[in-house]
Amino acid sequence: MAAAWMAPAQESVTFEDVAVTFTQEEWGQLDVTQRALYVEVMLETCGLLVALGDSTKPETVEPIPSHLALPEEVSLQEQLAQGVPRYSYLGQAMDQDGPSEMQEYFLRPGTDPQSEKLHGKMSLEHEGLATADGICSMMIQNQVSPEDALYGFDSYGPVTDSLIHEGENSYKFEEMFNENCFLVQHEQILPRVKPYDCPECGKAFGKSKHLLQHHIIHTGEKPYKCLECGKDFNRRSHLTRHQRTHNGDKPFVCSECGRTFNRGSHLTRHQRVHSGEKPFVCNECGKAFTYRSNFVLHNKSHNEKKPFACSECGKGFYESTALIQHFIIHTGERPFKCLECGKAFNCRSHLKQHERIHTGEKPFVCSQCGKAFTHYSTYVLHERAHTGEKPFECKECGKAFSIRKDLIRHFNIHTGEKPYECLQCGKAFTRMSGLTRHQWIHTGEKPYVCIQCGKAFCRTTNLIRHFSIHTGEKPYECVECGKAFNRRSPLTRHQRIHTAEKSHEPIQSGNVSCESTDLIQHSIIHTESSPVSAVNMETPSIAAHSSSLDINGFIVEETLPL
């Protein structure tokens, strides 16, 4: 078929002379962009021909055969009421078996109608395969715009769109597409119409039910109530999600560590811990984040001040919730209590972290060595041990640290600040841990107890060093002779033998001794008295055949002759 326009005293020109048509095989080789370009060009061509046709009136147009034409008195709304979809163009429903006479009329001349039919119920014109002359004929016959002809009289507005897409006559797009890929391509061509506007905020929706759901936000209505606690919700899905907190239902399971979640979004977010994915990247500094909330807060540091200030200490925050959480520090309130041991916390997140101690859960696993951690912060710090990353650098000396608090503590060396002062003797310290250890001198407290012999120590390092006596471990080995020691200090003294370093001289002799114990023993020869009076220094009493001498802070185990 070819629609032609006749101009006075001009030769007849058919639409085929200016149109470009494709076979089914050729059309299938075009991507979505190429198809869209084809439609755009054909619409422009049709528009020009229709404009030319206005001067000559429709009578000059070769009419569509009368047995295929749509009766004039039947409107589009009446077609829809009868269950006829708009993409049948001229009244022929597309979900019937085989092409209709109208479809055969639209097919390219000389082609087999059966060969042009794709995947059963899908017609050519619906997929966009209708020839340009067929579309143009529709424009001329029905006096509509190119867009209306292509998309099935969209000018009738959102009502028709709603009827078709909502399926008032049980008609759905999916029924026409046996292959999902064709549906996706089709939806990319169709304009996304959102005819339902919210009168409160102007937000548009494609379906009326979505508008009704949204409008509840403005009215404050919460029709869905939890029967367990009485809490109300504005959506049924929110109620369903909330009810899982009562019944303990956690249907979403992590395939990596087996951890369960009551929300799919929480599982997705958790899986980023295993994958290391950080999809949220700051455009300003390039820093990446695992969670959107952290990314949003970080962005505010580039663009905004901290509008929420604490009235007690003046510290600023980007969000009011963070200020409220911070203010609990000043009030001393701890509303979140552990049901296992009764310990209370001022943050819900701290309580959750604490509960992992009771459950033994360690969800954060190092991908390098397989070590697992209870807290995410500890996991991040451990990863830096593998990568060697030290992001916190001292501006004074350039020394870098992997932990921020180590940098703050180090900076006190440059400032000379010692903020931690002992109330008993007035001695000041740069670290809280130093003050705590010092106070044990006054209290006599020794919190670190050996589980083997019960001996107590005020420092963990002393306990660890002592425990090697029980285990027999000797990690410090001399590289010269292979002799091993359980402490570093005996190894250091031993190495002087190899280096011929003679650091100690006897009191009355020119002979030089290698070690402090040798010096003590040598002094006995001259004084013929106990080692204590010989060296004139405070040492523990010497037991028979064995003693433990504390010299210069080192605990030295030696067997001394008496």
Swiss-Prot record:
Keyword Zinc: yes
Record GO biological process: regulation of DNA-templated transcription
Keywords (A to Z) from UniProt: DNA-binding, Isopeptide bond, Metal-binding, Nucleus, Repeat, Transcription, Transcription regulation, Ubl conjugation, Zinc, Zinc-finger
Zinc finger annotations (C2H2-type) as residue ranges: 196-218, 224-246, 252-274, 280-302, 308-330, 336-358, 364-386, 392-414, 420-442, 448-470, 476-498
Record GO cellular component, one term: nucleus
Domain of life where this protein originates: Eukaryota
SMART domains: KRAB, ZnF_C2H2
GO molecular function: DNA-binding transcription factor activity, RNA polymerase II-specific; RNA polymerase II cis-regulatory region sequence-specific DNA binding; sequence-specific double-stranded DNA binding; zinc ion binding
One matching Pfam family: zf-C2H2
Places the protein is found: Nucleus
Domain KRAB: 13-99
Main localization (coarse): nucleus
Tissue/organ expression: Ubiquitously expressed at low levels. Highest levels are found in pancreas and liver.
Cross-link Glycyl lysine isopeptide (Lys-Gly) (interchain with G-Cter in SUMO2) placement: 117, 194, 203, 207, 209, 250, 278, 287, 300, 305-306, 362, 371, 446, 455
Family: Belongs to the krueppel C2H2-type zinc-finger protein family.
Functional summary from the UniProt entry: May be involved in transcriptional regulation.
Protein's recorded name: Zinc finger protein 460
Gene assigned in the entry: ZNF460
